[in-house]
Amino acid sequence: MSEKDNNLTPWQQKHLEYQKRKAEEAKKEKKANQPKKVHFSSPFLKSLPKTEKNFDDTRDEAESAELLEEGFETNNEETQSSEAPIENEKIIAQLEQLSQENEYEYEEEQIKRPSRFFSLFKGSAPLLKKMWPALAIVVLVFVGSLYLISPLSKISTFSVSGNANESSEQVALASGIQTSDSIFNILNNKEKIEATIEQKFPRISAVTINYHFPNRFEAIVKEHTNSVYVKRNDQTYLVLNNGYVITTPVDATKLEKLPVLQNFNDEEVKTFVNAYETLKPAIKSLMTNVTKTPTDATKDFIAIDMSDGNQVRVSLSQLADRLPYYPSVAKQVQAPQVVDMEAGIYTKPKAAYDAYLSQLSTSKSASISAQNAKKTDASSENTAQSTTTSSN
C-alpha cells in the first residue's frame, strides 16, 4: 500500500478496495470471453503444398500458435498492470473530490439547519410578532427597575477642577451634592446647582457640571481674573475683572503688578474696570496709579501714572475710547510729559503742567475768596439796614 493510500480515510480505503475487486472481476470476465487458441497463417506455410503437410508440421504449428497466444496474453497482462496505478490514482482523485463535496454539502446543511432553540419557536413567529411591543416594554421596565435599585443609580464621586482660589471642598459643600443622591435628581437640577455655586463664590464666573459614565460627576469651574486694586483708608483691596471688590484687605507687600485706584467708590471702580478690560495688554501693563482729578468742565477727570514716566489725563467715561491712542503719542514725546485727553489730545511737560495746575488752583482760590468777601459785605449791609429800619 502506497503512502498516498495510507492518507485515505477508512471509507475511502474500503471504496478503493471495492473498485480494485471490480477491476479484477472485469479482467477475469474479459479473459474468459477470449478464445483459447488463436491460429495465425504463416507465409511460409502457405508456400508449401497442402499435400506435403504432415502430422509433425501440424503439431509444430499448434505449438507455435500456443506460444504466440501465451505471449499475447502476457503482453495484455503487463499492459493492464501498467495501467492499474494510473486507474488507482484517478480513483483516489475522484474519491478526494467526492469527499470534499460531501464535506461541503454537510457544512451547508449544518448552516441551513435551524438550532434546537429556534426550533422550539417554530410556528410561533406571528404570535411573537404581535407580542413584541409588550415584551419590549416589560424588558425595559425590568431593566430600569434593576438599575434604580442598584448602586449604579447613585452618585459615587464628585470632583472639582479649574479652581485656583476656591477650594474643592468648599465648592462641593456649596453644591449640596452627596454621594447617596440619585443621578437623575442631579441631572434634573443641574442648572440650579450651577447657579447656586456661582452665587456663593464671587470669584467664580461660571460652573459646568458634567456627567461621566457610570455614576461620576465633575464640576468644571472658571474663575474671574484679578484686574486692579483699590485703596481706601490706607487699606488695599483686590478688584476682580467683573468689578467686584473683595472685602478682605490684601497685604501691601504681596501686591501684584496691577493699577491701584485711589479712593474710588464701588460704582467708579466698576466703570474703570469695564473700560480697563477692553484695553490691550501692552497699555494695561503701563498703568500704575490712578487718582481722581475733577475739573469744572469734567467731573470724572482722572490722572493715570504710566510706568514710562508720563501721565495721562482723561475722563473716566472716555477711558476706553481715548487711551488706545496713547502708544502712538508716547512715541512722539520725551518723558516726563502730561498727555491731556480732556478736549482733544495735546502734550505738555509735566513740570509746566503742574505749574499751570498750581496757578489755576491759586486763581480759583482767589476767586472763591473774593466771592466769599462779597457775600460777607452784602450780608453786613443787609444787617445794618435792618438795624436802622428797626430804630426808626
From Swiss-Prot:
Subcellular location: Cell membrane
Keyword check for Thylakoid: no
Domain POTRA: from-to ranges: 153-224
Compositionally biased tracts (Acidic residues): 58-76
Annotated keywords: Cell cycle, Cell division, Cell membrane, Membrane, Transmembrane, Transmembrane helix
GO BP terms: FtsZ-dependent cytokinesis
GO CC terms, sorted: cell division site; plasma membrane
Ranges per topology, Extracellular: 153-392
Membrane-topology annotation of the record: Single-pass type II membrane protein
Segments traversing the membrane: 132-152
Region (Disordered): 1-87, 368-392
PANTHER family: CELL DIVISION PROTEIN DIVIB, CELL DIVISION PROTEIN FTSQ
UniProt family annotation: Belongs to the FtsQ/DivIB family. DivIB subfamily.
Protein's name according to its UniProt entry: Cell division protein DivIB
Species assigned in the record: Lactococcus lactis subsp. lactis (strain IL1403) (Streptococcus lactis)
